[in-house]
């Protein structure tokens, strides 16, 4: 699998033999899903993200007066909870102080050419197969 990263390090395109997957870290460091499907080239599909004032959708503080930017309507890769996106959460967290907000924001990335395991989770190990992983690091408020 090939992993293509844009020069500014914010657009990621994963290519298999027959398919492509693309995601993008926007100017507020929210990692957005752009595309999954039939193989495409390396074009930037972030222009497909359509933001419009939905009236009922909340806006994050950093959007300022921009009523068109809402976590509730964006196709987030890793949606948090308690921060303005009222769809189903990917993860629910309760902190020791009883709060539950999880605001995931893109921080950095690395490309690994080997398999890795998360402690306590199942993993595959096969020396006959080459691995390429894109690991997006995100910071989360209150975590």
Predicted regions: what they are:
Residues 128-129:
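Acidic, proline/serine/threonine- and glycine-rich low-complexity intrinsically disordered segments
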Residues 132-139:
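Conserved small/polar residues in nucleotide/adenosyl-binding loops
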């Amino acid at each position: 699998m090939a992993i293509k990263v844009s020069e500014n390090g914010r657009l990621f395109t994963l290519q298999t033999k027959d398919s492509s997957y693309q995601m993008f870290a926007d100017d507020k460091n929210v990692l957005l899903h752009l595309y999954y499907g039939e193989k495409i080239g390396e074009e930037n599909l972030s222009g497909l993200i359509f933001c419009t004032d939905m009236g009922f959708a909340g806006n994050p503080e950093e959007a300022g007066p921009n009523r068109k930017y809402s976590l509730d309507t964006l196709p987030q890769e890793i949606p948090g909870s308690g921060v303005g996106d009222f769809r189903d959460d990917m993860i629910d967290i309760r902190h020791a102080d009883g709060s539950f907000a999880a605001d995931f924001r893109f921080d950095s990335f690395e490309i690994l050419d080997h398999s890795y395991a998360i402690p306590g989770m199942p993993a595959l190990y096969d020396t006959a197969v080459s691995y390429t992983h894109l690991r997006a690091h995100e910071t989360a408020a209150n975590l």
